[in-house]
């Protein structure tokens, strides 16, 4: 098995997390998984959705989008089409669920955090890059809210990261790029906490059904890659 990038089966793409990437948001990063690049911002606003009013807890929600020419051919903006596509809705819900798992919302006060993930260049793994980068931006945003005295305590329960794994040419591989993803027999997106818990596992057999042994091999590979991602997040936060 030869990966198009020349990477080993268990090798992540070069990953870079640049903090404080934009001026106005409480937290922001540019996250790069190889040639996939996503700007993740976290904005804090006072108040919560109607269903949470008066309960003394906060909320987190997410939006996701891709620039028209983030891919090989230009895609029409969803705003000009008048509605979001099913893929966009699925991904932004995944991002929201994943980041809420990192927080104790009762310590957020009646504040809402808006996660915005905008893909400026796509080469596979945009949702996993978004979750990994948005976690760092979220931690920076919480530090800003703490300085403002807006928090009841430390809402952060755990770090969260995500990575893709798949079966490519019959072999489990880590962190698929677009060429691999397009030809993979199986594709999984895995979201985990730094304590080793799984938040979400999304898996689809594209070429042939996968067997329990292959699923276990992919999950083990994801866990291995996740440890590297948590180290990269911590290193970025230490800068």
Curated annotation (Swiss-Prot):
Please tell me which top-level EC class this enzyme sits in. transferase
For this entry, list what GO says about its biological process. Answer: rRNA catabolic process; rRNA processing; tRNA processing
Cite the EC number: 2.7.7.56
Cite the CDD domains for this sequence: RNase_PH_bact
Alphabetical UniProt keywords = Nucleotidyltransferase, RNA-binding, rRNA processing, Transferase, tRNA processing, tRNA-binding
The domain of life for this entry's organism is Bacteria
Q: Which reaction does it catalyse?
A: tRNA(n+1) + phosphate = tRNA(n) + a ribonucleoside 5'-diphosphate
Identification of the protein by name: Ribonuclease PH
Organism for this UniProt entry: Pseudomonas paraeruginosa (strain DSM 24068 / PA7) (Pseudomonas aeruginosa (strain PA7))
Which gene does this sequence derive from? Answer: rph
